[in-house]
Amino acid sequence: NDAFMYLIIHNDLNHKYPNKFSMHDFRELNTKENNPYSGAYYTIRSIRENEIDIWFVLHHNPGPLAVWAEKAVEKSEVAMWGPRTSFSPPNGTKSYLFIADETAQPAALASIENLRDNEKYICLFETQNESTKFKYDDPQNRIEWIFREDIAAGEGTKLLKRVENLSMDPKNLYVFCAGEAKQISIIRKTLKKNLSLNADQMSFTGYWRKTG
């Protein structure tokens, strides 16, 4: 499902991690005076034996991990802690609503691929424009793309307007929503009010926060 890992990278792309490097080591070695490591949560798109796929969103003014992803080469090392998950639908769930920006779409897709054949879903995927969406074999044809166009990530209103106009039966519905923290908070309040959802029918996670 939406398994996510905490990835830790070193300022030196050629850095080799010691055996049994842990989250404790990360916290101990990073001080106010010296912080050679950076870390952030990323969701796992897919898992194979001895391999995992993680999607990075490359953008202007990237953070340390996005910079690392652009420069990484074969055998570049990264430390990982986890996985964890926030996708926990209650028993009896029959339909799903996935709402995600670029950072959360891998988690949504991984969750969709684990649904049973008789379970229905709707996806609202936000991205910049037609050129930044990806192709996906969607047997139910239930992925709806919402484009920000010239609006910066974390500032668009089209996704919220689409959510406000949703008409869904809340019975046996589970909502997974993740993306920019402030937008997710607004969407959560909107859905809770409009659909009268119980707490166990919702998973809302801020994957990142817009600053400035």
Where is each model-derived feature located?
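Extended, composition-driven regions rather than compact fold-specific motifs
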Residues: 2-212
